[in-house]
Regions:
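Predominantly a Rossmann-like dinucleotide-binding segment in NAD(P)-dependent oxidoreductases
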Residues: 21, 131-204
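Short, Asp-centered acidic motifs that coordinate Mg2+ and/or phosphate
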Residues: 40, 74, 154
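N-terminal Rossmann-like dinucleotide-binding module
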Residues: 1-56
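Rossmann-like NAD(P)(H) cofactor-binding subdomain of soluble oxidoreductases
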Residues: 83, 103, 126-132
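Rossmann-fold dehydrogenase core element
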Residues: 113-130, 150-154
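Beta-loop-alpha module in the N-terminal Rossmann-like domain of NAD(P)-dependent dehydrogenases
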Residues: 56-117
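Hydrophobic residues in well-ordered beta-strands that form the structural core
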Residues: 62, 99-100, 125-127, 156
Length: 204
């Protein structure tokens, strides 16, 4: 049973979500139970945007610049894979905190620009890599830091997500989808993130 979090001295975090496909999971989760309030949605998919906007009763935008003018504290990026870094930079510069789906950036230059913008604005940026927060990875972190498994000197990570052809087509329709053209070695967050989270180290 989920208990409602008490926020007696804290105001709700007003959140806007860009992307009404994958982003719907974030829109649903941004509620008062976790001290958040969904206030705006943004997408170029007008039909779906209108449908989801009506469901949640929030403002909708097809223009990202206008979306950023909305009165909100944070932006959740669930748009296209290769768009995250430039969209995050714009949101940070607009005074918004940012949580971004993976990947954070697709080039080193984008990564540098993103880090510099975070430092310049002082706003919070979070990469929403979800796999470290599964129950078994949480337990592995506990075991590692408690010393119950001894001293760890080497670790590797691998992630496999078996899916039926029907499910693959459902989440990755057509050759223009990023999963169809992106080299698999570019998307290794589920393999590396748990290791980094469990050990508090950076892979080499």
């Amino acid at each position: 049973m989920v208990e409602k979090v008490k926020h007696t001295n804290e105001k709700k975090i007003r959140v806007g979500v860009i992307g009404v496909g994958r982003g719907q999971s974030f829109a649903q989760a941004a509620n008062e139970v976790v001290g958040m309030e969904l206030v705006a949605l943004c997408d170029r998919w007008e039909e779906r945007l209108r449908e989801v906007g009506q469901r949640y009763g929030v403002a909708t935008y097809t223009d990202y610049e206008k979306f950023l003018e909305h009165d909100m504290d944070a932006v959740i990026l669930a748009n296209y894979f290769h768009q995250h870094a430039p969209f995050a930079v714009k949101a940070l510069e607009a005074g918004k905190h940012v949580m971004s789906e993976t990947a954070s950036n697709t080039t080193l230059a984008e990564g540098v620009a993103l880090c510099r913008t975070v430092e310049k604005t002082g706003k919070t940026y979070m990469l929403a890599e979800n796999y470290p927060f599964t129950v078994f990875n949480q337990e592995m972190r506990r075991l590692y830091h408690s010393g119950e498994i001894g001293e760890v000197t080497y670790a590797e990570g691998e992630y496999n997500h078996p899916m039926s052809p029907r499910d693959r087509l459902r989440i990755s329709p057509g050759m223009k989808h990023w999963r169809a053209w992106l080299p698999s070695t570019y998307y290794c967050t589920h393999a590396l993130a748990p290791l980094m989270y469990i050990t508090d180290t950076i892979p080499v």
